[in-house]
């Protein structure tokens, strides 16, 4: 699924999805949720006006979705891709959540920021909500990012999270399509792994057979610095992090701290949700 607010950023995320999954047979849902547009209308002062404005915005949403669909089919024709348009009167987070569960989505691809978000923020408010609460992998595409095949993938890990096979299969398929190298980066001043960590490391090996795996270790204590340095030094195309309790990502996904941490991500960012569904 690719949520859209019809901004250039949202269309850029859709373009990335079409290119990164160009070898896969996909059903791509392009979804626009428009409740906020209805309630933010200055002329909406009486209940009697609600249905009129809602209908007007609904028709406009459907027109815009058709334009997006025509444009993406024109730019990226692909017989493996089938598209479905969804126009919904609801909040973005609720509509994404409902559609993820109804259609058993494999991934949500969206821009890090929408049309109206503050450019000084790493993530817009809608993207933050989706990253935090949707029980499905989310791939966030930075503003203005020009597509590069994900040949070099950074996957920081402490080898303590019990990963899910379905989400690892997603990474395996993506890496297999592009013969990617996955850099498994262990960030810890203590190099030696416990038996549990060794078992989880082996599980990753077994679950990612299509990729070339590199197991790296850094003794850098600051995780942000470690990740940022590695992205630059190894020319990384895609960053993968796992959203689980007490993880680095959980700390990062706080609106009050995300921009203080300083991880200003300029490459696509895949969040795997360590939640069962």
Model-predicted regions and their roles:
Residues 1-50, 152-217, 236-238, 264, ...:
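Small/aliphatic-rich secondary-structure junction motif
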Residues 1-12, 80, 107-112, 118, ...:
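Intrinsically disordered or low-complexity boundary/linker segments at protein termini
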Residues 49-63:
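A short acidic, glycine-rich active-site loop
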Residues 70-108, 208-239, 243-259, 263, ...:
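Structural beta-alpha unit
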Residues 117-122, 249-253:
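Glycine/threonine-rich flexible loop motifs
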Residues 123-126, 198-201, 253-258:
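Charged helix-capping and loop-helix junction motifs
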Residues 128, 172, 202, 228, ...:
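Active-site phosphate/pyrophosphate- and oxyanion-stabilizing loops and adjacent acidic/basic residues
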């Amino acid at each position: 699924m690719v949520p859209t607010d019809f901004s250039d950023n949202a269309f850029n995320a859709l373009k990335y999805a079409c290119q990164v999954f160009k070898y896969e047979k996909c059903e791509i849902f392009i979804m626009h949720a428009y409740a906020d547009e209805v309630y933010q209308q200055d002329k909406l002062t009486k209940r009697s006006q609600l249905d009129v404005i809602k209908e007007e915005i609904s028709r406009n949403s459907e027109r815009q979705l058709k334009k997006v669909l025509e444009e993406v089919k024109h730019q990226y024709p692909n017989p493996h891709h089938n598209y479905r348009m969804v126009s919904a009167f609801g909040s973005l987070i609720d509509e994404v959540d409902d559609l993820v569960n109804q259609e058993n989505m494999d991934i949500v691809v969206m821009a890090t920021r929408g049309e109206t978000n503050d450019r000084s923020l790493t993530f817009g408010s809608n993207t933050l909500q989706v990253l935090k609460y949707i029980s499905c992998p989310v791939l966030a595409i930075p503003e203005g990012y020009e597509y590069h095949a994900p040949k070099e993938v950074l996957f920081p890990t402490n080898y303590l999270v019990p990963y899910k096979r379905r989400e690892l299969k997603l990474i395996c398929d993506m890496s297999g399509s592009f013969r990617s190298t996955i850099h498994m980066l262990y960030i810890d001043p203590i190099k030696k792994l416990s038996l549990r960590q060794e078992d989880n490391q082996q599980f990753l090996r077994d679950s990612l057979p299509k990729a070339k795996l590199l197991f790296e270790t850094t003794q850098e204590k600051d995780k942000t610095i470690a990740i940022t340095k590695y992205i630059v030094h190894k020319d990384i195309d895609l960053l993968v992090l796992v959203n689980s309790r007490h993880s680095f990502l959980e700390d990062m996904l706080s609106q009050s701290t995300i921009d203080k941490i300083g991880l200003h991500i300029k490459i696509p960012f895949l969040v795997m949700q360590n939640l069962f569904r």
